A protein has these predicted regions:
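Active-site-adjacent helix/loop patches that line small-molecule binding or acyl-intermediate pockets
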Residues: 1-80
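Domain-terminus/edge residues, biased toward the C-terminal soluble/receptor-binding domains
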Residues: 34, 49-51, 55-56, 61-231
Length: 231
């Protein structure tokens, strides 16, 4: 179901060799902040030198979710491959993440699920990475070393707890202690875009028992030594 042969093909296409691609995987994991991860192959089948943890996998999943094509693929419930010159009949594919699509039963379909990936080996047992979104807040849930159907049940319970007890605040819409610093226009060619601004997409997650005003803020300045701020 995981098309391991495709993982090999992609690895050779991108990295030139399997070994080079695995090195790229480990470098990317390090770049993302993973501290308990080491890859030994591109497909994830068991290897003593191939390991990760829930937190590191969440870091990787968060980075992957920034890619629009990835979001489309993991969020697709069903897909039909039309006939090709290699296969005369169409091929119907179903997503095996039962929180997204009722592959075998509809008991585990989760409201707000936007995709994810299942996994299983004899050594790792069932694993699952799932994305879910409600009221503008997207969560990533990672469960490992479970026995089916607990990968679905544990993920649902974790999602329910977070959605029931936490909420996302848009900082720019709620911040009252700071505002944008506008540039003064000099001449007709200059713009009035702010040179100091609050990211309009930045958010903070707080307990539902808290208000945005309960949070404290701190300005951390970039190191601008020798930077030119005006001429």
């Amino acid at each position: 179901a995981s098309a391991n042969e495709c993982a090999y093909a992609v690895a050779e296409h991108v990295g030139g060799t399997i070994e080079n691609f695995v090195a790229m995987m480990n470098e990317k994991a390090k770049e993302l902040g993973c501290q308990n991860t080491h890859f030994a192959n591109p497909h994830g089948l068991h290897d003593e030198n191939h390991y990760t943890c829930c937190y590191d996998m969440a870091l990787i999943a968060r980075a992957a979710y920034q890619n629009e094509t990835f979001r489309i693929i993991v969020g697709t419930a069903r897909y039909t491959i039309p006939p090709t010159n290699k296969h005369s009949e169409q091929t119907d594919l179903q997503n095996h993440n039962e929180m997204l699509y009722p592959f075998q039963t509809n008991k585990y379909v989760y409201d707000g699920c936007t995709g994810g990936k299942t996994g299983y080996t004899n050594a790792a047992n069932s694993t699952l990475v799932t994305y879910a979104e409600r009221e503008g807040m997207t969560l990533i849930c990672v469960v490992m070393n479970t026995q089916s159907p607990n990968q679905w049940l544990d993920s649902r319970n974790l999602f329910d707890y977070c959605f029931d007890n936490f909420q996302l605040f848009n900082i720019a819409e709620n911040e009252t202690n700071y505002t944008s610093a506008e540039q003064k226009s000099v001449g007709t060619l200059n713009t009035n875009e702010p040179f100091v601004d609050i990211d309009k997409d930045a958010g903070i997650v707080l307990p539902k028992t808290a208000e945005f005003s309960d949070a404290t803020s701190k300005i951390i300045y970039d190191d601008v030594t020798n930077d030119t701020v005006g001429t």
